Amino acid sequence: MMTSVGEPELQVSTDGVVTLKPPRPGDAERLVEGRDEEFFRWLGPGAETPRPVACVWVGEELVGWVDYDVEHDWLRPGEVNVGYYLFPAAREKGYASRAVELLLQHLSRETEHTVATLVIDRENVRSLRLAHRLGFVKRGGVEKGLFFAREV
């Protein structure tokens, strides 16, 4: 999971279906419990105590997280790397796209970042579809997969 030290805290944000909220006490345990084989396949082992920028909620149900960070040597000035994960029961419903779009709106309004990036494994079809749906453009390949970017 990523952290964004020195970044403005995300305020509660919603599109009427998906809501992003800052993590609360107890959320980290629920985020760890929500991991499955896909989590480990695409994201690796993950943090023991995850602290994302925001938790993703649908109604009263915690369904995943979104995050971003700026601490990669391959990022250009003004760029951030975005990450996300939804629990299995929340997939294939459009929630990930909605959550990432809300995060991009936060980045646009509350930070000086101008470009969001995604690094996606070539075999991660759902994330490749999300990148296309949200207007990310492939900028090439990196060791971990394909590299996408879009303005925020």
Task: Tell what function each PLM region has.
Residues 1-38, 53-152:
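Acyl-donor (CoA/ACP) binding surface of acyl/acetyltransferases
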Residues 41-50, 57:
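A short, aromatic/hydrophobic, helix- or strand-capping loop or linear motif
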